[in-house]
């Protein structure tokens, strides 16, 4: 169930084909599986089981009690009977020929008469075909006189007695015989034509009976006239002529005082039986023959008129003539009927499935599907957003420039909306290609340009260069990139308040200052590399002198080393020692003081006991995984007396155990 026509008078499609062509079973099953979890299809359900035919449906009617729906269709020719109380198919029955139209003679489906395309009338009961009778010429419509129990069959061609009139066959169902036909003027036929007449033979196209009122019969002809017969006098009482085209549809109002007729040119007229001039004239807009006319009444006692051709269903206000609402199915329509005392409309159409429309403003849902009212209220409360993904909005001047203005009101490819129309995207592309043959080359060049621009935008772009504080810009950009926030550095560059920070050298950050180095101790300054090395070396030398005052035994330091777990030594290739960079740059005449480990020269063992020697050898033979400080080389470079003020060394709390040793090499 979906909203077909949004607006002041909404129309809901309860059942009907989703495509204009019948799909094969395997493709239909695949679409059902793929649309199972589609949010738009959550309200879809099957109202009546097997409410369809193999190819198309011809006619559909509802019984007077509202419990049965009978429909005819093809192929193979057959008719279906649905039970509305069970919402399912009761039975189906095949016939010998295709059905033209049918009538329900009883309040339920038990008695029905069917007009077939092979000039036969079939009477069906629940047990089967009760009787079949053949009529002299092809019939166009059926009507039933309940007072006299007669079936009226308007036919094609002229009578056989040479009077030059068309005939309406009368079959008395009580006596089971044909009565004298009523003669209707349908014009002249070509001389020498057969019994059925020529191709252009006149015909009585349609019949209507004013039931429950005066019972006057009206017959529409192919020459644009309407003749009225009184069944009591069995004679013609009036003629209504001068209509454009053939009369294809007739319908009496409930009070029997007005008559609506439709022509083959799509014109609709409403007449008062007391006045030959029409009360209302309307145009269906499609230029197609009118198939059905139905008088309707809303719950507020407003009188409406339904008109239908094979393309669209329109409902008019009978008093003002304004369009109330409309429905445009995807397939061609063959017949339209209204479920009495409700807002539901059923159609027989060329599609496989028959349509079922529900108009809440026209009336409540039938009692056999009363749940539709609650479903409609739920759908109205939901927020709907209608999208036109496959449509292009064009104004009327734009339609004229594309030579599409002749399609206005003639196809569903143009949907009126506000001051323009929604045009189907495929039609729009074809029209543009016809009006401008070079549009494809222009579109191709445009897409290539967009692709190149997209590739350029995806490249990694460097940070904008500035005159001053370039490192500050890079640092801020890197920090913002890690946090995943917008680029604040770019905003700072564009902000005039911070303009001088990146342009004026007076705002340059001095990275060699003491404050900067205290706040950024890990920042490497290329220009002050040599000074930093010298500071470190002199600091190490002074610390060695201060620590040389104390003395301690090496044995006291061994327990701390033994607590560390030994690791497997990694064999490293021997490298040739290269002089340091600052050593290579020194002149040869400068004084250089070097300190080397005392273990390289060997110690005196003369006054040492043998046990202590063995113990020392054992300790020396242990594998030490830590850094061997005794093998380091320190180089001291004398400096001038004028020294730069050194920043105070950062004091960190001691976490290791206090040692009495003053060995400077141990602290390296």
Curated annotation (Swiss-Prot):
InterPro entries: Beta-prop_NOL10_N, NOL10/Enp2, NOL10_2nd, NUC153, WD40/YVTN_repeat-like_dom_sf, WD40_repeat_dom_sf
GO BP: any one term: maturation of SSU-rRNA from tricistronic rRNA transcript (SSU-rRNA, 5.8S rRNA, LSU-rRNA)
Bridged cysteine pairs (disulfide): none
Domain of life of the organism encoding this protein: Eukaryota
A GO cellular-component term linked to this record: 90S preribosome
Name of a matching Pfam family: NOL10_2nd
Feature: compositional bias, Basic and acidic residues: 557-602, 610-620
Gene3D superfamilies noted in UniProt: YVTN repeat-like/Quinoprotein amine dehydrogenase
Subcellular location as annotated: Nucleus, Nucleolus
Skewed-composition ranges (Acidic residues): 542-556
Residue spans of the WD repeats: 199-239, 242-281, 288-326, 328-367, 409-450
Keyword match Transferase: no
Entries under SUPFAM superfamilies matching the protein: WD40 repeat-like (SSF50978)
Disordered as annotated region, ranges: 518-668
Keywords from the UniProt entry: Nucleus, Repeat, Ribosome biogenesis, rRNA processing, WD repeat
UniProt xrefs under PANTHER family: NUCLEOLAR PROTEIN 10
Homology family: Belongs to the WD repeat NOL10/ENP2 family.
Quaternary state and interactors: Component of the 90S pre-ribosomes.
Protein function: May be involved in rRNA-processing and ribosome biosynthesis.
Name this polypeptide is given: Ribosome biogenesis protein ENP2
Species this protein is from: Chaetomium thermophilum (strain DSM 1495 / CBS 144.50 / IMI 039719) (Thermochaetoides thermophila)
Organism classification: Eukaryota, Fungi, Dikarya, Ascomycota, Pezizomycotina
């Amino acid at each position: 169930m979906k909203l077909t026509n949004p607006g002041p008078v909404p129309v809901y499609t309860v059942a009907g084909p989703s495509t204009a062509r019948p799909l094969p079973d395997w493709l239909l099953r695949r679409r059902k599986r793929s649309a199972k979890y589609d949010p738009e299809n959550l309200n879809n359900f099957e109202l009546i089981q097997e409410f369809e035919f193999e190819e198309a449906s011809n006619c559909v009617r509802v019984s007077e009690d509202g419990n049965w729906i009978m429909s005819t269709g093809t192929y193979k020719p057959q008719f279906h009977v649905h039970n509305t109380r069970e919402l399912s198919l009761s039975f189906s029955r095949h016939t010998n020929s295709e059905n033209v139209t049918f009538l329900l003679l009883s309040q339920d489906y038990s008695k029905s008469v069917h007009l077939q395309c092979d000039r036969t009338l079939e009477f069906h009961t629940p047990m089967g075909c009760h009787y079949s009778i053949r009529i002299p010429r092809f019939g166009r419509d059926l009507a039933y006189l309940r007072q006299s129990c007669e079936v009226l069959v308007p036919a094609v061609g002229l009578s056989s007695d040479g009077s030059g009139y068309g005939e309406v066959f009368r079959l008395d169902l009580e006596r089971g015989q044909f009565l004298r036909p009523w003669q209707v003027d349908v014009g002249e036929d070509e001389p020498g034509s057969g019994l059925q007449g020529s191709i252009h033979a006149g015909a009585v196209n349609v019949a209507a009976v004013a039931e429950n009122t005066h019972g006057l019969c009206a017959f529409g002809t192919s020459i644009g006239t309407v003749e009225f017969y009184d069944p009591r006098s069995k004679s013609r009482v009036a003629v209504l002529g001068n209509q454009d085209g053939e009369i294809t549809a007739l319908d009496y109002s409930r009070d029997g005082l007005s008559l609506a007729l439709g022509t083959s040119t799509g014109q609709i007229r409403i007449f008062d039986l007391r006045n030959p001039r029409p009360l209302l004239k309307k145009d269906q807009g499609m230029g197609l023959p009118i198939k059905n006319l139905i008088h309707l009444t809303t719950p507020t006692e407003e009188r409406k008129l339904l008109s239908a051709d094979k393309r669209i269903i329109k409902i008019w206000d009978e008093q003002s003539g304004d369009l109330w609402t409309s429905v445009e199915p995807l397939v061609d329509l063959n017949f339209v009927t209204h479920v009495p005392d409700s807002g539901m409309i059923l159609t027989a159409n060329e599609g496989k499935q028959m349509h079922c429309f529900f108009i809440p403003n026209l009336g409540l849902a039938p009692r056999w599907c009363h749940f539709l009212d609650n479903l409609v209220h739920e759908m109205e409360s939901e927020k709907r957003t209608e999208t036109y993904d496959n449509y292009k909005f064009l104004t009327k001047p734009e339609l004229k420039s594309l030579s599409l203005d002749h399609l206005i009101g003639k196809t569903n490819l143009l949907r009126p909306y506000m001051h323009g129309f929604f045009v189907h995207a495929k039609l729009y592309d074809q029209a543009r290609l016809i009006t401008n043959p070079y549009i494809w080359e222009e579109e191709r060049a445009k897409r290539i340009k967009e692709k190149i621009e997209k590739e350029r935008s995806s490249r990694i772009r460097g940070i904008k260069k500035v005159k001053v504080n370039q490192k500050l810009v890079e640092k801020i950009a890197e920090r913002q990139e890690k946090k995943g926030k917008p680029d604040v550095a770019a905003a700072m560059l564009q902000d005039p308040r911070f303009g001088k920070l990146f342009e004026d050298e007076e705002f340059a950050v001095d990275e060699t200052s003491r404050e900067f180095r205290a706040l950024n101790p890990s920042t490497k300054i290329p220009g002050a590399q040599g000074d930093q090395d010298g500071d470190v070396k002199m600091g190490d030398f002074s610390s060695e002198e201060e620590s040389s005052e104390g003395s301690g035994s090496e044995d006291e330091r061994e327990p701390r080393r033994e607590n560390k777990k030994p690791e497997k030594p990694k064999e490293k290739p021997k490298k040739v020692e290269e002089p340091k960079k600052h050593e290579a740059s020194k002149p040869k005449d400068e004084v250089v003081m070097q300190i080397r480990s005392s273990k390289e020269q060997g110690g005196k063992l003369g006054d040492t006991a043998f046990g202590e020697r063995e113990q020392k050898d054992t300790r020396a033979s242990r594998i030490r995984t830590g850094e061997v400080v005794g093998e380091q080389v320190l180089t001291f470079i004398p400096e001038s007396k004028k020294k730069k003020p050194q920043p105070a060394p950062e004091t960190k709390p001691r976490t290791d155990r206090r040692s009495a040793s003053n060995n400077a090499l141990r602290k390296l």
